[in-house]
From Swiss-Prot:
One of its GO terms (molecular function) is structural constituent of ribosome. It comes from Alcanivorax borkumensis (strain ATCC 700651 / DSM 11573 / NCIMB 13689 / SK2). The gene is rplN. One of its GO terms (biological process) is translation. This is Large ribosomal subunit protein uL14. SUPFAM superfamilies: Ribosomal protein L14. Belongs to the universal ribosomal protein uL14 family. Part of the 50S ribosomal subunit. Forms a cluster with proteins L3 and L19. In the 70S ribosome, L14 and L19 interact and together make contacts with the 16S rRNA in bridges B5 and B8. Binds to 23S rRNA. Forms part of two intersubunit bridges in the 70S ribosome.
Length: 122
């Protein structure tokens, strides 16, 4: 469950390490974002010579949350951290690698690239 001001780890090799959510997209007064939701973020910590710089405002998709996601069979998948993957204007990942597991809930038309790059799909 991500809201405005939430800090997230970055799960790709775009050059950003930590980002902060500045807006949850999808609805005029939407408060929370879960796994698979798109948010606006600002880069708070980045590595030198990366594709993105500190202070850049980007779009991101949430791939892991501490809150987790409930499956139809009743099982709950949750993680130790909140993490996101940075996206460009075409909703394609900025990085070329994804670190850590992602969930099957991302398996939609627009996020198949993230699923194919991920080392593990839960």
């Amino acid at each position: 469950m991500i809201q405005t001001e939430s800090m997230l780890e970055v799960a790709d090799n775009s050059g950003a390490r930590r980002v902060q959510c500045i807006k949850v997209l999808g609805g005029s007064h939407r408060r929370y974002a879960g796994i698979g939701d798109i948010i606006k973020v600002t880069v708070k910590e980045a590595i030198p010579r990366g594709r993105v710089k500190k202070g850049d405002v980007m779009t991101a998709v949430v791939v892991r949350t501490r809150k987790g996601v409930r499956r139809p069979d009743g099982s709950l998948i949750r993680f130790d951290e909140n993490a996101a993957v940075l996206l460009n204007n075409n909703k394609a990942p900025v990085g070329t690698r994804i670190f850590g597991p992602v969930t099957r809930e991302l398996r939609t038309e627009q996020f198949m690239k993230i699923i194919s790059l991920a080392p593990e799909v839960l």
